Design a protein with these regions (language model features):
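Conserved ABC ATPase signature
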Residues: 163-167, 171
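Conserved ABC ATPase "signature" region
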Residues: 92-93, 140-159
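ABC ATPase NBD coupling module
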Residues: 94-110, 134, 140-141, 277-281
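Catalytic Walker B motif of ABC-type/P-loop ATPase nucleotide-binding domains
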Residues: 188-191
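Helix-to-loop junction immediately C-terminal to a conserved catalytic motif
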Residues: 77
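Conserved catalytic motifs of ABC-family nucleotide-binding domains
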Residues: 184
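Short coil-to-helix segment of the ABC ATPase nucleotide-binding domain corresponding to the Q-loop/switch region
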Residues: 122-130
Length: 296
């Protein structure tokens, strides 16, 4: 089953909230940092960080271990609070929100970790629909239809009744992506989702990320240490062809909404397209790429 942007079943997904913090008709960036700093004891991780991600855009976040990539994601989720500056998600400042209000903001964010724990006693379909089933306002049949649509989009429809223990590592990662996208979040955060997978399986995960970006128009941040996969995602796009989805090569001009951000010493050291990153004469960027790029 092919999943197109906002299928009819999505009308059953409850977007109403008792708090009404988020105005989805507004034009505010999906994510915005304004002069954000955070430190742990004497270790300053982020220094006066400022950037904005328009809705529907993608940022691929690179940097050496300890550069603050995962900290940045936790700030977006409100799991950490900045020492200074402002973090906004869909126009809402999350840095000082109480936990009850943060639940509304997080309800529009999907998160995929390197090791997403699945419920071993639940089937694939039950895992994917778990968060939807908790919404009392969503009919059971609508949950089933949404789960079927998501599994069809991700290419795992035939695995709906299997248990996680019956899946390969790559299939489990794809189930984690399906679970994250089931509630139709407008923002998806990927924290090293490809690490530990062999190159062929990793490419299937890359393709799912590309499909979500281009066909579902979600705003996404991809944190990865896998430079090959980062460039693959930045140089491919998903298109419909003869009723099926294809992931094809693309140049930077056709993907203006995709940019790299390289963190170094707590700051955004570089921001630009894949071509601009590869062409950068900056000594640190050259050294970083030399140490991390595979021998193509």
């Amino acid at each position: 089953m092919a999943l197109r942007r906002r299928p009819s079943v999505s009308d059953a997904v409850d977007r109403s909230t008792p708090l009404g913090l988020i105005d989805y008709s507004a034009t505010a960036p999906a994510v915005e940092f304004k002069n954000v700093s955070i430190a742990f004891d004497e270790n300053v991780v982020l220094r006066h960080l400022s950037f904005a991600i328009p809705r529907g855009d993608m940022r691929i976040l690179l940097g050496r271990s300890g550069s603050g990539k995962s900290v940045l994601l936790k700030l977006i989720l409100g799991l950490l609070r900045p020492d200074a500056g402002t973090v906004l998600v869909n126009g809402v400042e999350v840095g000082h929100l109480p936990e009850r209000d943060l639940l509304e903001v997080r309800g529009d964010i999907g998160m995929v970790f390197q090791e997403n724990a699945l419920f071993d006693s639940l089937t694939v379909a039950e895992n994917v629909g778990y968060r939807l089933s908790e919404q009392a306002t969503m009919p059971v049949e609508a949950v089933r239809e949404r789960v079927a649509a998501v599994l069809g989009f991700i290419g795992l429809a035939e695995y709906a009744d299997r248990l996680p223990s019956e899946l390969s590592g790559g299939q489990r990662r794809r189930v984690a992506i399906a679970r994250a996208m089931a509630p139709e979040p407008r923002i998806l955060l990927f924290d090293d989702p490809i690490t530990g997978l062999d190159p062929l399986i990793a490419t299937t995960i890359d393709n799912e990320i590309v499909k979500l970006r281009d066909l579902q128009q979600v705003t996404s941040i991809l944190v990865t240490h896998q430079i090959r996969d980062a460039f693959y995602v930045a140089t491919h796009r998903a298109v419909w062809h003869d009723g099926a989805v294809q992931v094809v090569s693309a140049d930077a001009a056709s993907l203006p909404h995709v940019e790299f951000m390289v963190l170094h010493e707590g700051r955004i050291y570089f921001q630009g397209s894949a071509a601009e990153l590869l062409a950068s004469p900056d000594p640190y960027i050259r050294e970083y790429l030399l140490l991390t790029l595979p021998p193509w």
